[in-house]
Amino acid sequence: MTTAIIGTGNIGGQVARHLVAGGEPVVLAARDESHATALANELGPLASAAPVRQAIAEAEVVVLAVWLDTSKQLIVENGDLLHHKVIVDPSNPIQLDGKGGFSRTLPDEQSAASVIAGLLPADAPLVKAFGTLGAEALASSANRRPRRAVLFYATDDEAAAATVERLITTAGFDAVKAGGLSDATRIEVAGDLHQYGGMNGNVVDADEARVAVALAA
């Protein structure tokens, strides 16, 4: 199985590094193709770079590691290639506020995942994942010992869940399901299961994560 990672910034780059370290082949794409090529060269033979449409076509899983508005544009432009792909959305509905912080771009009750899901083909299952930690923690917490760090995910599709659980494990984390896509706000920024929300900056292990999921279930 090949995973396409669209976007090679703070999140996409770290996801690519962790997957390759775990032996997973990836194909990278970025708005500036030189960035994808440079990262692929850094990561070695399990990584390649391609234009966006080629990367999507070559992969079974597509990670949209870009800002929400860019994800929306990518889906509109490449929807014909997304049929039967597992789509992974790590985005958060935020924007820079010009004061060193962030502000939400959606109403509090609306998730980025719900926006993405509404644009995807019906046969392209969506999994909210790889966005529950900040970039620094995502980079430093893979294969943590003695207790592995958790990445939460949410989806309505059991087959897609199994696929993404395997990728999370390969990347060096434990996977804990937060619920279906209706629960995605819990694992986006300011949600009770996000590092920069109810987790108060902490990176939890599997036991702590399951307790946290159950508290608001």
Where are these regions (language model features)?
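NAD(P)+-binding Rossmann beta1-loop-alpha1 motif at the extreme N-terminus of oxidoreductases
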Residues: M1-P45
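Conserved beta-strand segments of alpha/beta enzyme cores
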Residues: P25, L46-S48, V86, P125, ...
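Internal alpha-helical scaffold of NAD(P)-dependent oxidoreductase catalytic cores
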Residues: S34, E42, S111, G118-L126, ...
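Active-site phosphate/pyrophosphate- and oxyanion-stabilizing loops and adjacent acidic/basic residues
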Residues: T37, V76, S114, G118
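Rossmann-like NAD(P)-binding element
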Residues: G44-A47, P51-V86, P90-G100
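Rossmann-fold NAD(P)-binding glycine/threonine-rich loop
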Residues: S91-A142
